[in-house]
């Protein structure tokens, strides 16, 4: 995410080499302008950002650090709007949220992603299928609800208003914390759609109306969001499909253009790939500093503290087993796409695009490891050191792999186990900190 913009900002920075060089500042601003417009930032937003950066840089004296500080401060101002980040809960549950958007915007999938996000916060969520315009919408929400592990409310041969009313009643009676209503979409905005949304909104009296905007729609998405806001009132925007070769400009400008807070960003195809939009954190990514806080939050949502402690003890003693290995793979899968996770780590933003299609679920290597482990006895799974030649031949036969592949996987597992053991001791932690420090020092000031 934001890699093209981040690279463009670095190019602009490199135009400034000496202090108090106004011509260099002009070149940097020109490069910044090209980057913004090339990445689909609205011309009014680009003009305002350039104005802020120029004014702030000149105020503090022209130089690389001053330009960076001005850019960081100006980006934060452009990205900030009145309203909350992430999800806001009502004082008295259930919190009712009406999800709105055009057909094909990813509204239904985003609704399920939001349900997953809330479930990681230990909230009881009810999904309501009110999109009766698209034939597969109800079925899609049912399937997604099952994947997430939340209840989906739907009714046949009922009007949208009846379904919404009954869903609200169900949410209150069963003491759900949150009710997410997937409303109808259209290929284009029309009076019929808006009238239906107004009627549903009147019945639900929702605490939030979140508009799902397709990141690939560019400025058309901003215009559509503005129309929805004028017609039914929108409290926040969720940007979907942001990983799909999006230029990133819509995220940079939609808050400033509409005056509405951007609440979440869909950062991948997987259900967990939904990131809270916190302006300070996004500026960090834009400046090449990653987003360690969001990464820590995602990790904490799937890791049990007691399990982590037990695993740490095993690693220190060199007792990491194949079962532990598979368990950790399952944990990582729950965090979302690899590219989304990598983009949060300082200095590794460039790797995110290379890992865009990396999927642990469909990875051939992971499938081979699973096949190998499933062909082992319980004793072998817990004691890798007993895997002699005859055992490896039997495992190869049972898993459909070559003995050479079994040997290779076991060797890599052994290397990983030794490395993990090394990193759990004091010297290993020191080495890791030094490595992170080196990576940090390879980038320009503040472009961490």
Swiss-Prot record:
Among Gene3D superfamilies, the record links this protein to: P-loop containing nucleotide triphosphate hydrolases (3.40.50.300), Signal recognition particle SRP54, nucleotide-binding domain (1.20.120.140), Signal recognition particle, SRP54 subunit, M-domain (1.10.260.30)
Q: Which GO terms describe its cellular component?
A: signal recognition particle
Q: Where does it mainly reside?
A: cytoplasm
**What Enzyme Commission number(s) does the record list for this chain?**
3.6.5.4
Where can this protein be found? Answer: Cytoplasm
* InterPro entries per UniProt: AAA+_ATPase, P-loop_NTPase, Signal_recog_part_SRP54_M_sf, Signal_recog_particl_SRP54_hlx, Signal_recog_particle_SRP54_M, SRP, SRP/SRP_N, SRP54
Gene Ontology MF term list = 7S RNA binding; ATP hydrolysis activity; GTP binding; GTPase activity
Task: Keywords in alphabetical order, please.
Answer: Cytoplasm, GTP-binding, Hydrolase, Nucleotide-binding, Ribonucleoprotein, RNA-binding, Signal recognition particle
Q: Does the keyword Hydrolase apply?
A: yes
Reproduce the free-text note on domains from the UniProt record.
Composed of three domains: the N-terminal N domain, which is responsible for interactions with the ribosome, the central G domain, which binds GTP, and the C-terminal M domain, which binds the RNA and the signal sequence of the RNC.
The record's listing under PANTHER family reads:
SIGNAL RECOGNITION PARTICLE 54K PROTEIN SRP54 (PTHR11564), SIGNAL RECOGNITION PARTICLE SUBUNIT SRP54 (PTHR11564:SF5)
Its function, per the record, reads: Involved in targeting and insertion of nascent membrane proteins into the cytoplasmic membrane. Binds to the hydrophobic signal sequence of the ribosome-nascent chain (RNC) as it emerges from the ribosomes. The SRP-RNC complex is then targeted to the cytoplasmic membrane where it interacts with the SRP receptor FtsY. Interaction with FtsY leads to the transfer of the RNC complex to the Sec translocase for insertion into the membrane, the hydrolysis of GTP by both Ffh and FtsY, and the dissociation of the SRP-FtsY complex into the individual components.
Q: What is this protein called?
A: Signal recognition particle protein
The species this protein belongs to is Helicobacter pylori (strain ATCC 700392 / 26695) (Campylobacter pylori)
State the taxonomy lineage.
Answer: Bacteria, Pseudomonadati, Campylobacterota, Epsilonproteobacteria, Campylobacterales
